[in-house]
Swiss-Prot record:
Name of this chain's protein: Gene 74 protein
Domain of life: Viruses
The organism of origin for this protein: Mycobacterium phage L5
């Protein structure tokens, strides 16, 4: 999943071998930078985790809610 927000582009990548989703970002045409990764909780899929990452970045859910839904 890739989405724009605040003049930046964000990308969520599924790491199948680690069962995690990574969040990357970049400003305009600069190089991609690693943001963070979250494990995929039991009962969720990578697309659901990526959508929660997007919701957190754009301010639809709080930091506390984000960490409750996607613990480390």
């Amino acid at each position: 999943m890739e989405f724009p927000f605040g003049g930046m582009t964000f990308q969520c990548l599924h790491l199948t071998s680690l069962d995690k989703v990574q969040l990357w970002f970049r400003w305009r045409s600069r190089d991609w930078q690693f943001g963070h990764a979250k494990p995929i909780p039991e009962g969720m899929d990578a697309a659901s985790v990526a959508n929660l990452m997007r919701q957190f970045i754009v301010g639809e859910i709080s930091h506390d809610e984000y960490n409750r839904l996607l613990p480390n």
